[in-house]
């Protein structure tokens, strides 16, 4: 708000990374923090001149960034609801999830939405239960599955008491999850509208979908802000920390995690996908694993290499080509 207000008034604005001003605070013995001291420290940073400015992104980038971050929070809310649904099912019908490859398949959720509890499933007409299964699975599942589910409901060793309370909770949680699913769909459409305004080819990188590409672009903004791929790696906070003193040099360095958490999360998700995708990055992951690296360490290495690929694609503004970038 302050930036927008001052910009509208015609002031020249410099945005300074708060890490730089906060580092100056650590020089003082007393770690007091208030508005007056914060203003003084910012003035000191400017007086010493040892700072770099951060440029603000254009309006479309900022709008897309807001939507992507909001989507991330909605996804987190949906994940929490799924965990609560899963917990309730473990209590009242622990055998149910084993009937499907995933509890969240449309067939599974269709049955849950209709019956909610194992008692209701057990008492449901078999033909009615089968119709739901047939419809939701697009005729892939047979009557045998309906019989199997009803038998499991009859023989469950889940909690038998307070079924009404569990049923009420499930109904509310499923309704909320469905509502969030619709919100995510609407958000995806809005995000893609913004993404398509840019001449961006991040989605051509194997393992990076359209929404992931939009998230990464929104967090990076103008690629010209970064002098090299190493600078982008540092901005994402996936650069290793350096621990050296005299002749000692640490061999177990962790990621700095000092950059954008949203960018880091998006890159790591993409790196995880790339690690198992038929691509040069998959070969790189296997190479690290063959060297005895832990899965997370190998994925971190893939994330850094992927960030270099992202940098090249944005810098050159052209689609991903394995021979060019890897």
Residue ranges and their predicted role:
Residues 1-326:
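A detector of single, family-specific signature residues
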């Amino acid at each position: 708000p302050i930036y927008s207000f001052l910009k509208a008034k015609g002031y020249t604005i410099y945005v300074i990374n708060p890490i730089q001003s906060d580092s100056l605070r650590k020089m003082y013995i007393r770690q007091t923090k208030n508005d007056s001291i914060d203003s003084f420290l910012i003035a000191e940073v400017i007086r010493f001149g040892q700072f770099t400015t951060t440029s603000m992104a254009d309006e479309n980038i900022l709008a897309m960034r807001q939507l992507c971050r909001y989507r991330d929070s909605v996804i987190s809310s949906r994940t929490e609801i799924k965990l609560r649904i899963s917990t309730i099912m473990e209590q009242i019908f622990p055998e149910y999830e084993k009937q499907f490859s995933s509890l969240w398949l449309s067939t599974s959720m269709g049955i849950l939405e209709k019956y909610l509890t194992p008692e209701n499933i057990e008492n449901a007409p078999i033909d009615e239960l089968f119709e739901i299964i047939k419809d939701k699975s697009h005729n892939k599942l047979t009557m045998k599955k309906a019989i199997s589910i009803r038998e499991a409901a009859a023989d469950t060793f889940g909690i038998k008491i307070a079924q009404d309370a569990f049923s009420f909770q499930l109904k509310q949680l499923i309704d909320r999850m469905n509502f969030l699913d619709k919100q995510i769909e609407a958000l995806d459409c809005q995000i893609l509208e913004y993404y398509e305004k840019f001449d961006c080819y991040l989605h051509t990188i194997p393992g990076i979908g359209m929404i992931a590409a939009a998230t990464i672009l929104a967090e990076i903004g103008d690629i010209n802000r970064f002098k090299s791929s190493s600078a982008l790696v540092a901005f994402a906070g996936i650069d290793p920390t350096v621990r050296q003193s005299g002749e000692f040099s640490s061999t177990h360095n962790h990621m700095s995690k000092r950059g954008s958490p949203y960018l880091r999360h998006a890159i790591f998700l993409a790196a995880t996908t790339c690690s198992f995708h038929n691509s040069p990055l998959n070969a790189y992951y296997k190479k690290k694993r063959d060297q005895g690296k832990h899965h997370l360490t190998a994925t971190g290495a893939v994330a850094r290499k992927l960030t270099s690929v992202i940098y090249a694609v944005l810098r050159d503004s052209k689609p991903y080509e394995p021979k060019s970038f890897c």
